[in-house]
């Protein structure tokens, strides 16, 4: 089915700046939909530092298995990504397909297979024909060029309605450093130590172990704090690469005590947060972005558990879709979270409108006053538990009939 662009999409989607030493090619492999690019090949001209976080699903794809195993090598020379087929739950044939893609990519670049990383997204459980990808890789390796980030983001889309890109340019170590990132995701979004698919590249010089440390920290407040439908994918992959090709003499930083560590980490966190919000704003059928802020919990973990319980509640999400400030459903979601709360201490706001205080409806609450707020595209739900100092914020989207239509029609 044809998908309308999300009403929450960015107004302007622009190309990202080229990065020295990074070349990109896309192609039409015809994996699922004809007449669109669905294959991405990112080429690094020199050995490049690599880090990654992946799904914790017990049914991971063959691509995830390979990336996990190769990460310890600490060097990347290429990334192959296909959309339309997840190559997950495909048994021995899935492993053979992954191996064939790895061999073809490594041969095209004349590098080792454990220096190639792969990712697949799309339908689960259907065999992926390797030849449709393998035959294209040699020419893609030759024609790959700097830039092309927008095309790269388009090539990895499935039910996404817009490509997701972000960039940061900043001073670090006396040099201008750039970070580019792309992502895809609209459904099956509830990451656990990872994201849907996202690839981030910087021209900074950073050792793989430090890159891994920064990525693992930055993902917590971004991709690990979003949810569309509470379903964690079999293919969730977030990978980051550092080429060290920044102009000028930029020494590789290899320690958390390096002055650049904090600066770079802050910029990386901001970029991942921007990409994560784009994913939520493209949640299948979404019309409202929902921000859930929980304070006063016994611990930060408890606060996040409560926040996710609210953000994942179908009843809360459908109430937002109906522009109904149904705070009773928020109370329900808090109560079922399974962590310590006191019903008689709860305070709930929608935006700046306080709806409930000390365990009952606010006597000053008036339905008419909040109606205009509920028609906005960004709805903030704040809950104070009243027990401690733990706090957390997560982001979600509403649940509309379009979500059911998109997923009911996905394999048609």
UniProtKB/Swiss-Prot annotation:
Pathway in which this enzyme or protein is active: Amino-acid biosynthesis; L-arginine biosynthesis; L-ornithine and N-acetyl-L-glutamate from L-glutamate and N(2)-acetyl-L-ornithine (cyclic): step 1/1; Amino-acid biosynthesis; L-arginine biosynthesis; N(2)-acetyl-L-ornithine from L-glutamate: step 1/4
Active site residues according to the UniProt entry: 195
Site (Involved in the stabilization of negative charge on the oxyanion by the formation of the oxyanion hole): 121-122
Taxonomy, superkingdom: Bacteria
Transmembrane segment boundaries: none
Residues at the site labelled Cleavage: 194-195
EC numbers on record: 2.3.1.35, 2.3.1.1
Major subcellular site: cytoplasm
Assigned GO CC terms: cytoplasm
Catalytic activity from the UniProt record: N(2)-acetyl-L-ornithine + L-glutamate = N-acetyl-L-glutamate + L-ornithine; L-glutamate + acetyl-CoA = N-acetyl-L-glutamate + CoA + H(+)
Keyword list, A-Z: Acyltransferase, Amino-acid biosynthesis, Arginine biosynthesis, Autocatalytic cleavage, Cytoplasm, Multifunctional enzyme, Transferase
Keyword Aminoacyl-tRNA synthetase in annotation: no
Entry-linked InterPro entries: Arg_biosynth_ArgJ, ArgJ-like_dom_sf, ArgJ_beta_C
Self-association and partners: Heterotetramer of two alpha and two beta chains.
HAMAP family listed in its UniProt record: ArgJ
Protein's job: Catalyzes two activities which are involved in the cyclic version of arginine biosynthesis: the synthesis of N-acetylglutamate from glutamate and acetyl-CoA as the acetyl donor, and of ornithine by transacetylation between N(2)-acetylornithine and glutamate.
Family: Belongs to the ArgJ family.
Protein name (database record): Arginine biosynthesis bifunctional protein ArgJ
Organism: Bartonella quintana (strain Toulouse)
Lineage: Bacteria, Pseudomonadati, Pseudomonadota, Alphaproteobacteria, Hyphomicrobiales
